[in-house]
């Protein structure tokens, strides 16, 4: 399809689960904008510009992906970028009710904006950025769970502490 879609999140940091969803979305849609959100209610490990750069580096092999940072309403961002749909990953039943509510709200706010739900590959179903940060804070190894750019950024952060 020749549609632009948006996959939004804080991506703090981007994980292999996120990358799986992005890669699969690129096979379904002409352009995937990975919208890296500024969320004032969260204290991120990486700054907005760092997170956006990590997404861009991690997706550099995907020619139809663009990493863009944003703040404000996702519905407004989608309208500005002429997106036809949002991509959302659903790991399990815990995510479904919340994601359906978001989908309906964004549909109303952006006049018909659709949401496409993609479950992650089985090997990434349990994975979240929160878990990666926990492993990192406790000096664990995250190499198997995140793209190389994130491994390097975490190592650099650890070396500078």
Swiss-Prot record:
Q: Which keywords label this protein?
A: ATP-binding, Coenzyme A biosynthesis, Cytoplasm, Magnesium, Nucleotide-binding, Nucleotidyltransferase, Transferase
Q: What are the EC numbers?
A: 2.7.7.3
Q: Where substrate is bound, by residue?
A: 10, 42, 74, 88
| Pathway noted in the entry | Cofactor biosynthesis; coenzyme A biosynthesis; CoA from (R)-pantothenate: step 4/5
Q: Would you identify the family this protein belongs to, as annotated?
A: Belongs to the bacterial CoaD family.
Q: Which NCBIfam families match?
A: coaD_prev_kdtB (TIGR01510), cyt_tran_rel (TIGR00125)
Record HAMAP family? PPAT_bact
- Designated name of the protein: Phosphopantetheine adenylyltransferase
Q: Which gene encodes it?
A: coaD
């Amino acid at each position: 399809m020749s549609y632009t879609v948006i996959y939004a999140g804080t991506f703090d940091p981007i994980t292999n689960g996120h990358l799986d969803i992005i890669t699969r979305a690129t096979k379904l849609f002409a352009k995937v904008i990975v919208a890296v959100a500024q969320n004032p209610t969260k204290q991120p490990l990486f700054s907005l510009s760092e997170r956006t750069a990590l997404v861009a580096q991690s997706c550099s092999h995907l020619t139809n992906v663009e990493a863009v940072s944003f703040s404000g309403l996702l519905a407004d961002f989608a309208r500005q970028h002429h997106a036809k749909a949002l991509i959302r990953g659903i790991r399990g039943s815990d995510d479904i009710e919340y994601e359906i509510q978001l989908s309906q709200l964004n549909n109303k706010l952006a006049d018909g904006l659709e949401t496409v739900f993609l479950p992650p590959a089985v090997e990434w179903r349990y994975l979240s950025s929160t878990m990666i940060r926990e492993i990192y804070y406790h000096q664990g190894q995250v190499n198997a769970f995140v793209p190389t750019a994130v491994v390097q950024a975490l190592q650099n952060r650890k070396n500078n502490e």
